[in-house]
Amino acid sequence: MNIIEANVATPDARVAITIARFNNFINDSLLEGAIDALKRIGQVKDENITIVWVPGAYELPLAAGALAKTGKYDAVIALGTVIRGGTAHFEYVAGGASNGLAHVAQDSEIPVAFGVLTTESIEQAIERAGTKAGNKGAEAALTALEMINVLKAIKA
């Protein structure tokens, strides 16, 4: 039986982070968590991290796809926050971001880590950006690094 598992240490990884400006008071914490995980745990060098800001979560798939197509990156991390309001807008934005990012990963065959919070309230978002529920930006970064190594092992 062959079992493929991988660790997250990836010192030579080239990683792009695309991040939404909308709700940046939360997204800034996601970004801090992602960068900390990349550098401290993944051992990724500063010069191998690119950050691309977009207006909102709905624009993340387009930027992630453009980054993936360059061939310069081993993974893309998408960060953003969508908070439910009183209209159906939440479903459209959250669904569009989620489905779009999944398509980018499948089409590009590089990891696209989903670090987009979809919450019922600002309080829930804050909890997931570094307080009670950990930092989902850091978790997305670790997922990206592990998947880089998993794909390398599969192709080896």
Swiss-Prot record:
Catalysed reactions, as listed in the record: (2S)-2-hydroxy-3-oxobutyl phosphate + 5-amino-6-(D-ribitylamino)uracil = 6,7-dimethyl-8-(1-D-ribityl)lumazine + phosphate + 2 H2O + H(+)
Protein name: 6,7-dimethyl-8-ribityllumazine synthase
The species this protein was found in: Escherichia coli O45:K1 (strain S88 / ExPEC)
Protein's job: Catalyzes the formation of 6,7-dimethyl-8-ribityllumazine by condensation of 5-amino-6-(D-ribitylamino)uracil with 3,4-dihydroxy-2-butanone 4-phosphate. This is the penultimate step in the biosynthesis of riboflavin.
Domain of life: Bacteria
Quaternary organization: Forms an icosahedral capsid composed of 60 subunits, arranged as a dodecamer of pentamers.
Active site: H89
Entry keyword set: Riboflavin biosynthesis, Transferase
Its EC number(s): 2.5.1.78
An example Gene Ontology biological process: riboflavin biosynthetic process
Molecular function terms from GO: 6,7-dimethyl-8-ribityllumazine synthase activity
NCBIfam families reported for this sequence: lumazine-synth, PRK00061.1-4
Binding site for 5-amino-6-(D-ribitylamino)uracil: F22, A57, Y58, E59, T81, V82, I83, F114
UniProt GO cellular component terms: cytosol; riboflavin synthase complex
Gene that encodes it: ribH
